[in-house]
Amino acid sequence: FFKQKTAYEIGVRLVGSEMCIRDSSGPMREFLNSPDPTEAAALAGVHRRVARGLGLLATLDVGVRPEVSEEPVILAANHRSMADLFLAAAIFSEWGWPIRPLVAGSYFDRPGIGGLLRRLRCIPVRGSEALDIATEVMADGWSVAVMPEGRVVPEAEWAPTGVGTARPGVGRLALARGRPVVAIGVSGTERFWPRGRNLPRISPWRRFPLRIRHEVLGVMVGDQPSVALEEIMAGITRCIAATESPSELFD
């Protein structure tokens, strides 16, 4: 993880940037079961500023936003880089969708990055409480984003299939809540901000390409979290392949 001063500086630059790269692709989404509009609008503002800052360093291809008929939903993505957090905020800004990621609680205790996570309304997760916390947040109308691998995965582990070993929590959450699941595949962040580096790679001559694709998996059925997890990870794997394929995978 990066040094404390570096984390603070990156947070200020990404959240405080006023340079406009591009506007959101549409208005904020509203559903019958939506979060408090004032809180959602405040979060959307932070997402926009992060998107503008990240746009100075990388090109973003986030695709069309998922077509879901109701909220809240569970978004599940792979995790190759610390840049995934900032890319997530940019994605949610582009989609006009106030979504709250679950993040390991230990990061909130670190100066600089902890403040940024709170401004992004990330949900701190400590141990086995993840399912209860996510359930409470979704009951208030918020969609949540999770990274089933639970850590930044080394390339040696994800290279064979595109993903690392996942933890079972997302399978339990999907079955317990009975909400639609959207699989997301991310590529490019591992080159932009490689695992183990204190800073992303910054070049004055080019911006790193970051690409995501998604697939709406729908509601998980059955009573076996391991089966639900397997289906979710298979969806993420297909989406990762689509980021590197001429044919694009969308629902």
Language model regions located:
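Helix-to-loop junction immediately C-terminal to a conserved catalytic motif
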Residues: 43, 47-79
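A cross-family acyltransferase "interaction/gating" segment
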Residues: 158-227
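Single conserved hydrophobic/aromatic residue that forms the stacking wall/gate
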Residues: 1-23
